[in-house]
Amino acid sequence: SKADVSIILKDKKNNTANGTTDKNGMLILPASEHKAYIFGYADGTFRPDNNMSRAEAAAIFARLISEQKGEKISGKSNFNDVSKSEWYSDYIGYLSKYGIIKGYSDNTFRPDDNVSRAEFVAMTVRFNSLFNDVKKGSYTVKYTDVATNYWAYSDVAYAKHAGWLN
């Protein structure tokens, strides 16, 4: 492959993005051609060693969907522990609308809890299914700590099949 080949991409809404290829033919888009998905904090920090909360993960997926669909992020959350006044309320409501996030049986979302690896994989598979035909259920996985009756088994198995997990 040849490096520095100019590429113009056009999406379903005729928005365009300009980029180039690297020496392996992979597309490189400049930062100006896409939005930021992970934000720093109001105090000017990034907190690279912190865990990610469920609310922060929701915000990332909401920003990705919003950009793909060309929509404003808004939505009403029906979870008991998500107040309209919280910074993450619209993100969680927006993802609920698309079925990307699920709460707990007590109708809570627990936005300040850390997001588990299984929860993140499940959100990723659900995100992918918004834009692609995802057929879960027929794949198996042999991780010793993921039983076939585990709540996210089909998501983990699909992600492994898709090559997202090693």
Predicted features by range, described:
Residues 1-12:
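Short, ordered, surface-exposed loop/turn motifs in non-cytosolic proteins
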Residues 12-27:
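Short, acidic Ser/Thr/Gly-rich low-complexity loop/linker segments typical of extracellular
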Residues 23-55, 61-89, 97-98, 102-121, ...:
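Feature responds to low-complexity, polar/acidic, surface-exposed segments characteristic
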